[in-house]
């Protein structure tokens, strides 16, 4: 059975194409809920007008659906709390010049 950690690890493969870094390191992944074969991914984007939003959501859907045992993936886009660079990992801040 898939675990939350499995999903988070897989989501390192979803990249924000504008920033060239994955959504986990960017702090865009807010939560992952796993209930048997069902996975719910709660995430944000760097801005409300992010042109890469639909592509990021498609990638989340694809990556999570490819995990063994996952039958249903729900994706929730949230703006609460609003994303800020403070949510990025230390490595991401350094690489992108925020550190």
Predicted regions, residues:
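Domain-level signature for proteins that mediate thiol-based redox and metal-cofactor handling
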Residues: 1-99
């Amino acid at each position: 059975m898939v675990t939350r950690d499995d999903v988070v690890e897989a989501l390192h493969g979803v990249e924000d194409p504008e920033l060239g870094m994955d959504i986990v390191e960017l702090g865009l992944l807010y939560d992952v809920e796993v209930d048997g074969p069902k996975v719910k991914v709660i995430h944000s984007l760097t801005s409300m007008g992010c042109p890469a939003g639909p592509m990021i959501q498609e990638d989340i859907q694809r990556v999570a659906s490819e995990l063994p045992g996952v039958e249903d993936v729900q994706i929730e886009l949230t703006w609460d709390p609003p994303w800020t660079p403070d949510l990025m990992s230390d490595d991401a801040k350094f690489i992108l010049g925020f550190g």
